[in-house]
């Protein structure tokens, strides 16, 4: 018998160290993980057997068994699934083979309390065995192969892989050598209760040996939960299925269990989590809904079953109309799958619309968790943008709460026809921006966009239900024309741009290429000036993002808008009319201030500091 000793990958070592020294109170999740792995092994072989029936010729009835050997301090879990050969044992148990485990590692903080809580959040598969066992022995024979292999470790840095002469049928057996301090798990009644709680939704029969170790008792109905009538499923069963499926500790916020019996037949059991999923913005943008065909698991990877922007969904979809022998490649551009995807998307958006109307408080929590991902759909060409925008909510500057676009439109002033927004990183900073002071002074609301994706979707969604969506940074905004003629007008006499030509020319001459144009603002009420862009130009925040990503090399020159009602601007204008052109330093300071307020870099920070010091010095002397 050949035997090979190997060291765990460093990443696995970190996990094992945490498992061995775990203070996590809910250690029974090791059974959830091992049952889930055994069920997956059976699902994989069931799928393969559709095209390779010889793999199950000797035993086509899948099952999982659990046994307690109290005398030897052992718990034994056995399945007759696909099994593992030597390479599989090394890859699956000696290295990081699962993205969820890799994400678990990235989330470790070094704080033992926080890290122990992560065990429940992520589930860490097979390695959770070491919370209750000081040694684990895995015996396995892969379907279609004759050799039996044994993997064994105490979790302290090394493991042994060997061939075995043991008589062993297809599948995997895991023996947990239970720690002395964890003897509670050797209690027959307690372990039976734990196994039953984690097995009710599993589609593979799970058998538990009696105390004598002779007779098997089936603990679950072995029917897929989603195939049962809703009236026969309790809320607790839905919750447990969700937690087992998604390795979650939270309860689902929304549960959608539907049977579609139209032109396309399928069943979906989908969940929207109540807490933010750890991998929501992972670069892979993986979707976590499993596809079954006639109760046979097909895949949960690289299948376009739900749109990427709904990747926070967890659950299963079971189709009656797809052939069991379909290849994963054929699923990429499959018309039946596309129809299922469209139906699910419509159903999910309908549920969100209903929830938004029922409870704004609950919906706000959902939006804080998943709104950023949902808005990504507004950038996709195939999305029904209007339906998606109906479930989007944004921060209202006027009311300081989250509102929908329909609520915004319902609050239009008499002659208003435009939806205004301002984008930035911080809502509090946006509220103090000069860009929106004029609009707010006329009780015209402005939506505050703070997600990076906002700057992208507004470029492909210029209107909503016939109303333009416009950035408050645009040069052509006139708050007087936006509001009703019956409203009180500012007592300041309104001078045309021509009357202020002396002023705008002076600013342009002083600032030169630093600005594209200098204009009289029709939206400022108190601030002296602000930066602005023309309707055809890129939004300021979007341009800054592209510079950070090195998509463009330099910022473009912006327009500078002046407020002639501001005392500083008024003084400069009066000086010009008196032929006094000695305000160049003040002009530059006003421009620098406008840049800072917009988050734009100041061209010369040293000169800016000197100008500011000079003006302060003059004021106090």
Curated annotation (Swiss-Prot):
Composition bias of kind Basic and acidic residues appears in 486-495
GO molecular function annotations of the record: ATP binding; ATP hydrolysis activity; ATP-dependent protein folding chaperone; unfolded protein binding
Task: Cite the residue spans of the region called B.
Answer: 329-544
Q: Which SUPFAM superfamilies match?
A: ATPase domain of HSP90 chaperone/DNA topoisomerase II/histidine kinase, HSP90 C-terminal domain, Ribosomal protein S5 domain 2-like
Its biological function?
Molecular chaperone. Has ATPase activity.
Please give the HAMAP family that the UniProt record associates with this protein: HSP90
Q: What is this protein called?
A: Chaperone protein HtpG
What organism is this sequence from?
Rickettsia akari (strain Hartford)
């Amino acid at each position: 018998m050949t035997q090979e000793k190997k060291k765990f990958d460093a990443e696995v070592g970190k996990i094992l160290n945490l498992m061995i020294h775990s203070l996590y109170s809910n250690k029974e999740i090791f059974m959830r993980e091992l049952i889930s792995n055994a069920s997956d092994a059976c699902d994989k072989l069931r799928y393969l057997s559709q095209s390779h029936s010889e793999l199950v010729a000797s035993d086509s009835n899948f099952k999982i068994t659990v046994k307690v050997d109290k005398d030897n301090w052992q718990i034994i879990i056995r399945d007759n699934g696909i099994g593992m050969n030597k390479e599989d044992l090394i890859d699956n148990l000696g290295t990081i083979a699962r993205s969820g485990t890799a994400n678990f590692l990235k989330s470790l903080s070094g704080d033992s309390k926080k890290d122990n809580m992560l065990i429940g959040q992520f589930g860490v598969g097979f390695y959770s065995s070491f919370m209750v066992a000081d040694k684990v022995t895995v015996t396995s024979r892969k379907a279609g192969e004759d050799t039996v292999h044994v993997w064994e470790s105490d979790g302290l840095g090394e493991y042994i892989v060997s061939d075995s002469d043991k008589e062993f049928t297809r599948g995997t057996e895991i023996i947990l050598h239970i720690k002395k301090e964890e003897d509670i798990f050797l209690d027959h009644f307690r372990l039976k209760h734990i196994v039953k709680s984690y097995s009710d939704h599993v589609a593979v029969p799970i058998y538990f040996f009696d105390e004598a170790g002779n007779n098997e008792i089936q603990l679950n109905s072995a029917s897929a939960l989603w195939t049962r009538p809703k009236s026969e499923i309790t809320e607790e069963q839905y919750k447990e299925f969700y937690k087992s499926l998604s390795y979650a500790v939270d309860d689902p916020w929304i549960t959608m269990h539907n049977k579609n019996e139209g032109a396309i037949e399928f069943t979906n059991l989908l969940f929207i989590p109540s807490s933010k999923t750890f991998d929501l913005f992972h670069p892979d943008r993986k979707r976590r809904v499993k596809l079954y065909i006639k109760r046979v698991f097909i895949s949960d990877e690289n299948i376009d079953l739900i749109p990427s922007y709904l990747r926070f969904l967890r659950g299963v979809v079971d189709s009656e109309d797809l052939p069991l022998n379909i290849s994963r490649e054929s699923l990429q551009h499959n018309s039946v799958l596309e129809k299922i995807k469209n139906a699910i998307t419509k159903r999910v958006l309908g549920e969100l619309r209903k929830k938004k109307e029922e409870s704004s408080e609950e919906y706000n929590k959902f939006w804080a968790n998943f709104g950023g991902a949902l808005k990504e759909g507004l950038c996709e060409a195939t999305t029904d943008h209007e339906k998606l925008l109906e479930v989007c909510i944004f921060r209202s500057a006027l009311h300081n709460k989250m509102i929908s676009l329909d609520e915004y439109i319902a609050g239009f002033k008499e002659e208003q026809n435009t939806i205004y927004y301002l984008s930035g990183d911080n809502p509090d900073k946006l509220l103090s921006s000069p860009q929106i002071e004029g609009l707010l002074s006329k009780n015209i609301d402005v939506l505050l966009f703070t997600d990076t994706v906002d700057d992208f979707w507004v470029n492909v969604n210029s209107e909503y239900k016939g109303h333009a969506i416009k950035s408050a940074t645009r040069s052509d905004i006139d708050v007087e024309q936006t509001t009703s003629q019956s409203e009180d007008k500012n007592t300041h006499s309104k001078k045309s741009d021509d009357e202020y030509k002396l002023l705008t020319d002076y600013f342009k001459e002083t600032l030169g290429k630093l600005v594209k144009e200098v204009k009289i603002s029709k939206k400022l009420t108190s601030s002296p000036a602000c930066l602005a862009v023309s309707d055809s130009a890129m939004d300021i925040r979007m341009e800054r993002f592209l510079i950070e990503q090195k998509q463009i090399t330099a910022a473009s020159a912006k327009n500078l808008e002046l407020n002639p009602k501001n005392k500083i601007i008024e003084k400069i204008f009066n000086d010009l009319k008196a032929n006094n052109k000695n305000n160049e330093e003040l002009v530059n300071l006003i421009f620098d201030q406008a840049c800072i307020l917009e988050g734009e870099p100041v061209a010369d920070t040293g000169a800016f500091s000197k100008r500011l010091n000079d003006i302060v010095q003059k004021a106090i002397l």
